[in-house]
């Protein structure tokens, strides 16, 4: 009996440890064109994960700033990962194809875009559940930004009122750390 209880506790402890070892890049998501993508492909680079919307008051300033950030820092060491979401004010009502066309045509977006998802509630995408749980900050509107380090750990989270320009130094710092780490590995 004691051995069975000890074994059960050991299994629970192992499961808890395995869950705590999970990181952002362990998840999969469907890209904007409908292909299942392992986020593992972004491991080893810094990611800024953003829930986007095409018809929001924050759309113009954020898409412009995010694309400039991608141009300045990406794609070898950094990527913006955009996840359209229609949960806040129904401001992303279009299809994935229309969302992609809008972003590429209007803002020349070159960063990866994913299919429309839920980012809060019981139907939230598992990657966003992870971002929310590990940062302690759940999106309450469009254009929440989560900074993920090369190992998949969340190292920052900002609400939509914080401009990309204000967090760019923090992102640049993460990218520089990554570049220095890669040089040391040579």
UniProtKB/Swiss-Prot annotation:
CDD domains on file: GSH_Peroxidase
Active site residues of this protein: 56
EC id: 1.11.1.9
InterPro entries: Glut_perox_Gpx7, Glutathione_peroxidase, GPX_AS, GPX_CS, Thioredoxin-like_sf
Catalytic activity: 2 glutathione + H2O2 = glutathione disulfide + 2 H2O
Annotated GO CC locations: endoplasmic reticulum; extracellular region
Any one Gene Ontology molecular-function term assigned to this protein's record: glutathione peroxidase activity
PANTHER family for this protein: GLUTATHIONE PEROXIDASE, GLUTATHIONE PEROXIDASE 7
Protein name: Glutathione peroxidase 7
Species of the source: Mus musculus
Gene that this polypeptide is encoded by: Gpx7
